[in-house]
């Protein structure tokens, strides 16, 4: 069974299959996307009060804020060892 989960910091985990984009929050268009998501009620803030370093866009139009660098999240997304470790936890092994 292949549910791949990605740690986005502070023990928060997101389904890798649902991720559309991982971007930096610095540009004005991304800041607008964050504000619009906040107004629509689809913003998930997983920063624990820390500075937002990555913005994760999902296929359900949810916007997830993470305190982890976008490169780190992308590396975890591409890491095969990480997915096996988390899949073992999900499968109960």
From Swiss-Prot:
Origin: domain of life: Bacteria
Pfam families, sorted: RemA-like
Family membership: Belongs to the RemA family.
Full protein name: Putative regulatory protein Clos_1422
Species this chain originates from: Alkaliphilus oremlandii (strain OhILAs)
């Amino acid at each position: 069974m292949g549910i791949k989960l990605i740690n986005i910091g502070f023990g928060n985990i997101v389904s890798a299959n649902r991720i559309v984009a991982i971007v930096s929050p610095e540009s004005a268009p991304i800041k607008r996307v964050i504000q619009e998501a906040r107004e629509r009620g689809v913003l998930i803030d997983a920063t624990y009060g820390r500075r937002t370093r990555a913005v994760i866009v999902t296929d359900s139009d949810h916007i997830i804020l993470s305190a982890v660098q976008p490169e780190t999240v992308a590396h975890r997304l591409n890491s095969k060892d990480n997915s096996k470790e988390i899949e073992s936890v999900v499968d109960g092994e």
